[in-house]
């Protein structure tokens, strides 16, 4: 038979073990990362998300003493990078991926045969920055306002075209054309640099880009409208879509995400490290130069925003009869 003394000793031992396990959780999290971390970027070198990510990697290296290695995996509208992180790496926090929030939210709506759920399988750790979409035309065209362009397109159905280099811009553009009742020909581009050049050279007559991207095309392009609640400091003459009565045009944000199933201590540690890095003067300066606002929303807020984007774009896709391709 077990004596009361033995029972008490067993209870004490169990309590001590429980406390040691509880203490080990935070300690393990603080020791993470213990080796190099990869940040996968589904954009080419030199593009705004790549530049931002490289600056972020430097700050994370300073904070942890561990290398944060940026790896560009470009292709298939981000699917190459997203599928790699969602399915091919361990859920251990040692691989992250940068994503446009709108890109993840629309991917399942536009792409057939995905082997992962973009919203479920790649939870955001932090929303890094927000930016504007700019609706631009070639500077060689005579239109000075968005409404002047719309009037011209209405008077010439099927004779003008617009472009895009990703599914988000395509979906947003189709929604805009449907709302305004415009008959415009769609021209797809595989690479964003080719698309930007097409706007600058009048190969296409209009299209959405990020604000930072179109800055590189000045003065060969003209911005007629921007997303956001206030006018852009970069293009103050351009009206906001809200001013034009078009309130459903979405803005741009970039998040940093991990594979679903990443242990909570590692997830929380990454969240804290990235939030700390985004608050530094260095990251704020880089963001500003790229025309981006370093909002640094935590994981809970970021997940809610992603779900809202997916819902809103789902409504748009249904309205325009979009089918995955």
Task: Say what each PLM segment does.
Residues 20-26:
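N-terminal signal peptide c-region/cleavage motif recognized by signal peptidases
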Residues 2-17:
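Bacterial N-terminal signal peptides that target proteins for export
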Residues 72, 98, 124-127, 164, ...:
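Structural signal for conserved beta-strand scaffold positions within catalytic alpha/beta enzyme cores
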Residues 87-94, 109-194, 241, 251-286:
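Hinge/capping helix and adjacent helix->loop/strand transition within the periplasmic-binding protein
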Residues 29-120, 157-159, 168-169, 178-208, ...:
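N-terminal (or domain-start) structured segment
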Residues 34-36, 178-184, 264-325:
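An extracytoplasmic/periplasmic, membrane-proximal ligand-sensing/linker region
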Residues 212-279, 308-311:
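C-terminal lobe and pocket-closing loops
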């Amino acid at each position: 038979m077990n004596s009361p003394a033995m029972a008490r000793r067993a209870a004490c031992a169990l309590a001590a073990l429980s406390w040691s396990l509880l203490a080990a959780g935070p300690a393990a999290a603080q020791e993470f990362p213990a080796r190099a971390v990869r940040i996968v970027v589904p954009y080419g070198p030199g593009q705004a998300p790549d530049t931002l990510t490289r600056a972020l990697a430097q700050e994370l290296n300073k904070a942890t003493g561990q290398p944060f290695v940026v790896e560009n995996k470009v292709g298939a509208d981000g699917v190459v990078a997203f599928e790699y992180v969602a399915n091919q790496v361990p859920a251990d926090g040692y691989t992250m991926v940068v994503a446009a929030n709108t890109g993840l939210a629309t991917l399942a709506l536009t792409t057939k045969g995905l082997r992962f759920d973009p919203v479920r399988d790649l939870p955001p750790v932090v929303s890094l920055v927000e930016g504007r979409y700019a609706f631009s035309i070639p500077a060689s065209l005579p239109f000075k306002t968005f409404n002047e362009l719309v009037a011209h397109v209405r008077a010439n159905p099927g004779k003008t075209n617009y472009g895009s280099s990703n599914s988000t811009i395509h979906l947003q553009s189709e929604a805009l054309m449907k709302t305004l009742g415009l008959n415009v020909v769609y021209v797809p581009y595989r690479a964003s640099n080719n698309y930007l050049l097409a706007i600058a050279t009048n190969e296409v007559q209009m299209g959405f880009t990020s604000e930072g991207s179109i800055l590189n095309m000045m003065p060969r392009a003209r911005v007629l409208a921007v997303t956001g609640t206030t006018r852009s400091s970069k293009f103050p003459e351009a009206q906001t879509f809200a001013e034009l009565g078009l309130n459903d045009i979405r803005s741009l944000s970039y998040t940093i995400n991990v594979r679903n199933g990443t242990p909570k201590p590692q997830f929380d540690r990454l969240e804290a490290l990235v939030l700390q890095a985004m608050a530094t003067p260095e990251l704020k300066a880089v963001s500003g130069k790229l025309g981006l606002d370093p909002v640094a929303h935590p994981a809970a807020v970021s997940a809610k925003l992603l779900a809202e984007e997916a819902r809103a774009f789902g409504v748009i896709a249904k309205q325009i009869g979009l089918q995955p391709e």
